[in-house]
């Protein structure tokens, strides 16, 4: 299969029920008559002839080519393909073409081989063997499962599935009460949706106040469901999951789960809409309760999704096993048995740091019902590689102790948020972990193709994608069937390399390059049609909004269900500036967002730089948001023979120490300092007499921190900030939404705050 995101695979098979026979002789006679007796007497008859010939001699589809390719190395698939072709031609299992008698005999032999193979597989796998997604567990799990009892609750499904019948009725008949899971994946896209969804044009139709956030509101593209949100337990959760969550919530001091933020956000997640939550107060800003509420919600949603997926597959496998006398291909002619993707992983959680992944995975384990986590495989290895602590309590994983029992927090001059993020030794950004849920255990470090959930950093997945592009023997096909994507702490990811994240999201739901043991006869049509990206739910969580997040959400999150995003009003942070600094804001004009960078540099070189070039005072710090801007400004200063030093993203510690000293003593008059360098290092710079914000920081808390670095006692302390109308998001977080709107629309282009 070619890794083409827009490719289409078609499943061609009979829509008749498996126990209904066709009048194949009549069908064959009509077809031969039309083809062998062409008429040229009238245009109408010529048209009929052309149409008939088109039906007989049509080009093979990508799906047919796929089956042929897979059949060349897999006899079972080859036999299935032959029978499928025979069905399309209107032939029964016993009827043979006169011209292809030998070939049909070989097909019938293949049918016997297939039945024999299936029987042998059943015996070898055993009753306890799990075969989700066409992938079987390894020998170790076989041994683990042999001693386990069958638990009826493990197979419960919210969409009630009736018993198979043999009187011509459908194998699967969903009840009138269909879960959000079933309703979402069973939807069939219209031709209009297929045409319009890739364009990424969305119109937000409604607004509704956000729960417990008086300054925020939700906006949505589809119908407003918040007022009529499901208010009765278990809120779409599997009962076992809900009961465990409720018990855990009460154990941690919670009184009313039903009206809690975490339950309400779970209901939003369970709507299967794409979600952009841009006002999550993170745990490192003393927002552990709000952060854990959102985390609980998307983790419960993820568990609910993979458990319902597993239950549906196991139910269908059980029903197929009860009807071994009926050929599997005929059973699978019922759409109710199309329950799988190309590969098993269904949930992808992207996180920026290993320490955050540790926190999320520990909570995922806690939220799993105890009967389904009797054993957590490789937990010690996980603690060693991801954590710096022996244990966490069951209340959102907030209790932190080091391996030797001492507190991991150490005295530091760094701010508390930096200590929470980077104070330990588990903050690297290169990791990937497969998590597999079996009936009574959780397997960490599972093979990615046999995992249910993948937790990874954008960097690690970007590296895997690059390796697959260079080496055709490697692949990232485990990303082909992701149905729920969670991007948590997107604000921290934006301080890394956003392009890595964009690349990963772009690679999701592409056609796989290999089969990976998948039963192609049970793949959902949405995958074969190349529409998986239109069904993928994307949940993005951040403490603030950036243009890059807006772009990703609008262009790469194409869920047919629609979108919800948060819009907030800000008060600003100017009051947190403790020094008497005269803060000047200068607006420059840019025709479009693609011209902003050039317009900013031009304004700086013509309006700002001449004022500081010949200054004898020195102590000028230029704060820059992005590394791209940093490089352009550095190159410009080099052409001006300016005395300056650098504190950039990739500066070595020795160079940083030298630059700080040179700036403080005045041997270098100008310092360039990037927001990313400040985010990771938090160096307090001494000797600042004049502050220029070449571009506004994304993180609003950085603004007063940088302002308060100005040398107290300096004569006429002043700062200058450049902005354009395209900087509205950053500007409103700093000066407040009301002031920002006035500054963007005013005829004046200079504003002062004292």
Curated annotation (Swiss-Prot):
Free-text disruption phenotype from the record: Abnormal female gametogenesis and altered embryo development with a disturbed cellular division pattern. Increased rRNA expression and hypomethylation of rRNA promoters.
Pfam families in the cross-refs: Utp25_C, UTP25_NTPase-like
Basic and acidic residues bias: start-end ranges: 80-93
Gene Ontology CC terms, in alphabetical order: nucleolus; ribonucleoprotein complex
InterPro entries noted in UniProt: P-loop_NTPase, UTP25, UTP25_C, UTP25_NTPase-like
The protein's role, per its UniProt record: DEAD-box RNA helicase-like protein required for pre-18S rRNA processing, specifically at sites A0, A1, and A2. Involved in the control of rRNA expression. Required for embryo development and female gametogenesis.
The protein's name: Protein NUCLEOLAR FACTOR 1
Gene name per UniProt: NOF1
